[in-house]
Every structure is written in C-alpha cells, then in structure tokens.
C-alpha cells in the first residue's frame, strides 16, 4: 500500500502525470524518474497554460522545490 509520497511517485513511473509548479506553471508528461528531493524527470513533456499546450519538450528535469503537486 502506498502511504508515502515517494511510494506514490514510484507507482506513477512510466505513466502520464501532471506537475503543477510554483508560479502557476504546469507540465504534463511521462514520469521517468525522481529522487528523494522530488526532482522529477518527464519524457514527452508539454507545458500547459489554462489546459492548453503552449510548448513541447523532449525530456525535462524539474527541480523538486518548485513542485506544488504531482497528479498521476
């Protein structure tokens, strides 16, 4: 049973997630990796504004202290 945040991230590996950042930025992509600081690696990442895609990226690394939430 996944009770800790890192357990939930582990269960979300290789699946699409939405990541909300400080400053109202949002990314959607496939979670490929993370560490204990909640630094995240997303593949096929897209930046969203108001639910619309504004930029597409191959892979992105998101610094954990900017993450507000991760939605699997």
Swiss-Prot record:
Belongs to the snRNP Sm proteins family. The keyword Cytoplasm does not apply. Residues 4-72 form the Sm domain. This is Putative snRNP Sm-like protein. One of its GO terms (cellular component) is ribonucleoprotein complex. Pfam families: LSM. Keywords: Ribonucleoprotein. HAMAP family: Lsm_RuxX. One of its GO terms (molecular function) is RNA binding. It comes from the Archaea.
């Amino acid at each position: 049973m996944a009770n800790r945040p890192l357990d939930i991230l582990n269960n979300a590996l290789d699946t699409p997630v939405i990541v909300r950042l400080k400053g109202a930025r949002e990314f959607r992509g496939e979670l490929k990796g993370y560490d204990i600081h909640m630094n995240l690696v997303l593949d096929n990442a897209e930046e969203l504004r108001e639910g619309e895609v504004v930029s597409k990226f191959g892979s992105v690394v998101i610094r954990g202290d900017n993450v507000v939430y991760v939605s699997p």
